[in-house]
C-alpha cells in the first residue's frame, strides 16, 4: 500500500467522564457506536480492515471489504466502527450478539453470517485522504475530509456530529433506544493522537474492560460463582480489582466451560477473607490472562493504584473478543467529579 499513514496504527482513545463537556466552541459531539472499533486503509483494490489492537478484521467481515471498495474514495485511511444493525421488534437497532458471533475460526460460518447479518461501517474520523496525512490536522478539518471520503450508499456511513453541547447531552438519552452506547466528545482543534486518550466518552453506565484472571466455583458446586477481574498497573503487574457474580444457573455452567481451557494447571490460590462472611471459601482458580470482559460498576475505592478496587461486586456485561488484555489498564476508568463534602451540603 502506498498511503501516507500505514497499518498497523493505534486508534485514538477516549477517557470516561460522568458528564458531557459543555464548553461552547471547544467540542464536537457524536453518538458512541456499540461495535468493533476499526481502522480502514484503502489504496485502490487493496483494503485492510484493522482492529483496535492491530489485528486483521477483514477475514471476519468479507462482505464489508467489498462494500469499502465500492463506497469509499480510492485512497484513504478512516477511523470508525463495524456494527450489525437488525430489525428488532419493528425497530432497527444495533445487535451486539450478532456482531460478536462473527469472530469465529470457521470460514463457512463467517460466510453464512455475512449473508444473514451483514455488517456496516460507520466512519467518524479521517487519518489520510489521497496522499495527504491528516494526523496533525484539527478535527474540524478531518471531519470535512471524512465526508469527502465516504459515499453514503448502503453499507458505509458517516456518523452525525454537532457542536451544540445541549444536543450532545440530549443524544446521551435519546440514542440509547437505538442500541447506541453514549456520546463521544472531540476537541475541534485537536490533532489525531494514536494510542492517546484524547477524546471524552460519556456512557449510560460506568463500565470497564477487565482481564478474567481467575474464578471461584459457586457454593452449590456447579459452575462459576464469580469471575475475578484484573487491571494492569503502569509497572505491568496485573492487579485484582474485584469480581463479577450473580449469574443464572445456566450461565454458571456456560461460563465454566468457556474458562476451563484457560486454567493454569490444577493450582488453587488462597484469597483474602471476606469482610461480610468469615465462613466463605475464598480460594480461587487462576487463569491465563487471555480473555477480556466488559463489566458495569458503580464506584472504585482506594487512594493508591495498588489499593484501588471495585467497591461492590460488578455486573458482567459481555466478553470483548476485540480487546487485548494489555489494554485493560486503570487509565480507562472514569474520574469522578472532584467535590468537597461541604460543597454538597446546603449552606447554613
UniProtKB/Swiss-Prot annotation:
Phenotype seen when the gene is deleted: Not essential; a double ligC1-ligC2 mutant grows normally, no effect on NHEJ. In a triple deletion with ligD NHEJ on blunt-ended plasmid is 90-fold impaired. In quadruple ligB-ligC1-ligC2-ligD deletions NHEJ on blunt and 5'-overhangs is 0.22 and 0.12% of wild-type respectively, only 4-fold decrease in 3'-overhang NHEJ.
GO biological process, one term: DNA recombination
Pfam families: DNA_ligase_A_C, DNA_ligase_A_M
SUPFAM superfamilies according to UniProt: DNA ligase/mRNA capping enzyme, catalytic domain, Nucleic acid-binding proteins
Alphabetized GO MF terms: ATP binding; DNA ligase (ATP) activity
Keywords from the named record: Ligase
Top-level EC class as recorded in UniProt: ligase
Name of the protein this chain belongs to: DNA ligase C1
EC number, as in UniProt: 6.5.1.1
Gene: ligC
UniProt keyword Transmembrane helix present: no
Domain of life: Bacteria
Role played: DNA ligase that seals nicks in double-stranded DNA during DNA replication, DNA recombination and DNA repair. Has weak intrinsic nick joining activities and accumulates DNA-adenylate. Acts as a backup for LigD in the Ku-LigD-dependent NHEJ pathway.
Record keyword Ligase present: yes
Cofactor: a divalent metal cation
Family: Belongs to the ATP-dependent DNA ligase family.
Catalysed transformations (reactions): ATP + (deoxyribonucleotide)n-3'-hydroxyl + 5'-phospho-(deoxyribonucleotide)m = (deoxyribonucleotide)n+m + AMP + diphosphate
Residues at the catalytic site: 32 (n6-amp-lysine intermediate)
